[in-house]
Amino acid sequence: MRIIVSDKIESVCPEFVGAHVEIYVHNSPYSAGLWGEIDRLGQEFRQTLTTETLKDISGIAATRQVYRACGKDPSRYRPAAEALIRRILQGKQLYQINTLVDLVNLASIRYGYSIGGFDADKFEGDTLTLGVGRAGEPYEGIGRGTINIEGLPVYRDAVGGVGTPTSDNERTKIDDNTTHLVVLINGYDGCEADAPMPSTFSSWRATTATVPTEATIFINKVKLWNRILTAAWHRCASG
């Protein structure tokens, strides 16, 4: 899978750095261990965060800033990581979908980064381009219907949008039959200290029998993900 970062994203977020991980998987309906970790994090968040202070989490704050730079109101179109944590702080349970989706959600709330998971066999073409949504661009968010993605960062394949930090697209969503997974990790803050993935990857292998096949860096400023993904890959392989 080839990933391109557009000039527009480079101009509004010169520090952007991200990663693409491609894995063959065996999905499952539910993982008790995974939900134990989600519940543990929920308890921690309720003790340490409010719906205002969660906006200061580095990955969330940076994503909100990119929204503003692109002309989108981040309080109306919240990044998914922020929306998920807000739901927890409001005393609500996260939706249980399947192990892969639940794991991506866990990574998102744990680190605050925009992390998208996709069924790679549903992509059209072999290239994804990260750009900015256009006026009137069609986009169906998962479980949300039509979303106005004008001003949102968006990944597009050969047909159209597949993922934004607010919602991924119905067309390429993970389902119970997904066996070819692509994960896109987006560091709009470029902050190495808070970077996700090594512990998440080891849990991932345990819960979904993953076999990592490719991990690449897509960046406009090289500074973050190579060491992290190499370590994650080796941990998965050694199991």
Residue ranges with predicted function:
Residues 1-229:
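Charge-biased, low-complexity intrinsically disordered regions
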